[in-house]
Amino acid sequence: RDSPMTEQADLMLKGGRIIDPESGLDEIQDIAFKDGKVSALADSLATMPAKQIHDVSGKIISPGLIDLHTHVYWGGTALGVEAESLTSRSGTTTFVDAGSAGAGNYAGFQRFIADPSKLRILGFMNISFAGICGFSKTTPNIFPECEDIRLLDARECVDAIREFPQSVVGIKVRIGRYASGNAGMTPLQIAREVAEETGLPLMTHVDFPPPDRDEVLNFMRPGDIWT
């Protein structure tokens, strides 16, 4: 399947393994790009001129990857990293932040991280009003954000989710000895209430009992995420 096309491409990648989950393609082929879009795809593009040609044999070419569990609220939590600094090394173009921000600070995440980024940045909103706030760069779990039930206001979380429909894709809760102390299943129950009202999935981080992991799994719904 040689390509008869001769229009000059901006970039050609030769001999890479092209994987496209949407079309089911998984083959070693040449691929060319023009004006930022795929212009040709064939077993060989030897007759097509290109401004840049790179042999990528042994490498994978794919659409941008999605990382479902990241913390990219740089400056908003000690866990936060700059998404732009990772994308060229990882091939990731969609970063899903796993609960760095809650109802009290998601607006900052949206305005200063998601909106200005050239990448696609989405978020799970933390059921805790303050998000993941109890970390420093040297000491984890200074403050378990889900231990104080006063921070777990379901109505505040629902209202904030509805304020940012362009980026919120779910609800995040962290439970266990270090994340929620003696609060038991209560943080998870509140988070599930929000998930059911908003029709969004729930992502649950579990550290050490209590609560028991089987109890947590049995409470989660199909389509929810364990992390």
Where are these regions (language model features)?
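Active-site gating/metal-coordination segments in enzymes
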Residues: 139-187, 193, 227
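Histidine-rich, glycine-flanked metal-binding segment
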Residues: 5-12, 17-62
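Hydrophobic faces of well-ordered beta-strands that scaffold small-molecule active sites
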Residues: 64-70, 95-97, 121-125, 169-173, ...
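Active-site core of metal-dependent hydrolases
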Residues: 173-227
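Metal-associated gating/positioning segment near the N- to mid-region
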Residues: 47-48, 55-116
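Acidic (Asp/Glu)-rich catalytic clusters
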Residues: 112-116, 158-166, 216-221
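Metal-cofactor-binding active-site regions of metalloenzymes
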Residues: 90-96, 100-101, 116-149, 172-179
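Short, acidic/polar
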Residues: 76-85, 150-161, 210-216
